[in-house]
Amino acid sequence: MLFSLRRLKKLANLEAFSDQKVIDSLINLGFEVDQITKLNEISGIKFGQILEIRKNPEADNLWICKVQFADKIREIQTAAKNVIENKQVLAFIPGSKSGNTTFLAKKLRGHISEGMLISAVELGFNKHLLNSELDQGVLVFDPIFDLESNPLKVLELDDLILDIKLLWNRPDGNSYLVLANELAAFFKTDFSLINKEISGKFYSELKIINKTDSKIFALEIQKLPKLALVDIFLLLKSEVKIGNLAQNFSNFILIYTGQPSYCLQLEKHQQKVELIEQKVKIKYEPDTISSYHFLNQEKKPLLIPEFSDQIIMENNSFFLIMPKFNLLKVKQIKQFLKKNSLKLTQLGKNYNYGTTFIALSFLNFFLEDQKIDFSWPINFDKSLISKKTFLDLNYNELKEILGLELSQEDISKTNLILEKIGYNFDNTSFSPPFYRVDIEFFADYAADFLRFYGLEKLKDCKLEQVKSKIPNPDLEPVKLKTLGYYETNSFLLISKEEDFNPLELKSQDLLTFPSQEHTKIRYSLAWQLAKITKYNQKRKITEINLYEKGSIAGWNHSLALASTIYTSEDLKKHLKILYNYDFDFLPADSEFLNPEKSQFIYLDNVLVGWLGQVAEKYNYENVNFLEILLSKVEKIPKKEGGKIKFRPYDNSQLKYRDITLSLPMKDIPDPYLKVIQKIPEIFSVKLINYVIINNQQKITYRITGPDQVCAEIDKFYK
């Protein structure tokens, strides 16, 4: 978003500080100042008041304006047809500059012109953003300015425009008030959004019947405010197109507070508005899309946000509608319209009720200043922002995260600054600012703490000297590639409806998320591999071996395998190749898994994974999975093996015995195999046959080894 540095400094009471210092502080606060642009290169311009207008008799399209300035009366010629007597103008007078051009008195068609009247374009504004009133000639306005005053200061024209890139999880930052609040806290000046109140002069009788999943708040206002010229210029600096009074007012609220809004007017007998979703069609477009419609009591549309605005009568009361629409619906509308307006972009962000509260408290101040009456908020109550989430404080963890030695005084001073932007602290916990959606974990608080403690202080932190150690090479990717697996990468986030969670991990619904398909942290990597496998099967790829290693819910690190080629027994062997642990496999009792083909994996009686196939309801037949929680496995120490002993070479031929296990359908062979595998010097145990007879599993294994192995097996059977 584009911000006026002059307005930010004015709001935050930073006129005593240099432009560069304020810009540097924004960067230190973590805001990316992508570009700095000077609005114009003009100097020496003056306010003037037109006393008289007459035509230049020697020119077809020139008018001679007698203009009163603070020091004298001057005659200035212009071709603009919108000049009016007794109105004020801006003018370059002799000695004024625009870039490398210095203005002088000059003779035009037989008459001296002592300067030039100024248009909006000559002030540095984009011609395509001007409405017809601003673009019809020179700037003409009511005589409200002191002719002695400096237009560059009064109209904030000596300005730098900052292109500030905000993180996607800081929608509140698209607001002059929020940025000014953080600057004031940083510089310790007198400005705060906190502890503001909302009120009203009367109670509105409007009832909003909301038949959608969106939230709608409103304010009844007795008269449409007209923005001051300096605020119109502020909209232009933000690259907002100037429209009618209602559009300008709504856009001004947007850039000041971050709250999108629409103006709605009702006839006097109307006291009810209905919000529905309904198909809408654009002229010359074949497709339709479902969008929001505000209907009157006769079910006729009054307002279709982003499709058609209502014409607002200037001196009649109206309603300022402040929505929080469904984010997915906004995204669809944005794609359909191929439109990227500031309002539509903000509607697609996950701002919270705190942003609405900031808008309401600002409107209280703004409308009172304009002497316009307004109602108490409709549908909004301060309790919406008073429900606070508290997180535990741990200052030792804070020091560890930041890598800084912090004194109690450092912590107390910085927390006092953080209170100015809305933090609340007690001895053991804190709550984040009411308008922030990005503070979910203690580490988020630590990041804010560092912003206001001072990033530059990280320079004083000396790195400790540590002894270097060459790490052991990670052979897992090599082993997996050798076994025929291909690596995949999937989204960390899944939709709220996806509940595949065989290991019963705890996830967390995020307050901010990129889309409705990605709202919480995944429970299982195997689930992601299942979706990738099905996608490839649709592409007629039948032989699939995939693996992924990554994070899942509960701060766990996981490895998952998926195969349409290997059996579950093969996957067990691969697990042994990857991690030389003595795993136990027990029948899996889970609604998410196929009970006849799945097992839980244990290590030292700790559940560390699962193996087999997912439940039939998911329709992933003939795909075998293995998922292991590496974060749990790594916490369990490996049992040290005994000393290696060498024996004389035995060149006798290996022999084998075939044994068959007869097991119930839900039983697994692993406990029985463990007994057999305790026989010393077994060379191999191989599955050679598996059949089901009379609802019994008949599983045949071939055990290969020297004579003493076969003797032990024979003795075991006897």
From Swiss-Prot:
Q: Where is the signal peptide?
A: none
GO annotation terms (biological process): phenylalanyl-tRNA aminoacylation
Gene Ontology cellular-component annotations: cytoplasm
Query: What reaction(s) does this enzyme catalyze?
Result: tRNA(Phe) + L-phenylalanine + ATP = L-phenylalanyl-tRNA(Phe) + AMP + diphosphate + H(+)
Residue span, B5 domain: 386-460
Q: Supply the enzyme class, top level.
A: ligase
What GO annotations for molecular function exist for this entry?
ATP binding; magnesium ion binding; phenylalanine-tRNA ligase activity; tRNA binding
Keyword Transmembrane helix applies: no
- Keywords in UniProt for this one? Aminoacyl-tRNA synthetase, ATP-binding, Cytoplasm, Ligase, Magnesium, Metal-binding, Nucleotide-binding, Protein biosynthesis, RNA-binding, tRNA-binding
What is annotated about its quaternary structure and interactions? Tetramer of two alpha and two beta subunits.
This protein is called Phenylalanine--tRNA ligase beta subunit
Natural source organism:
Mesomycoplasma hyopneumoniae (strain 232)
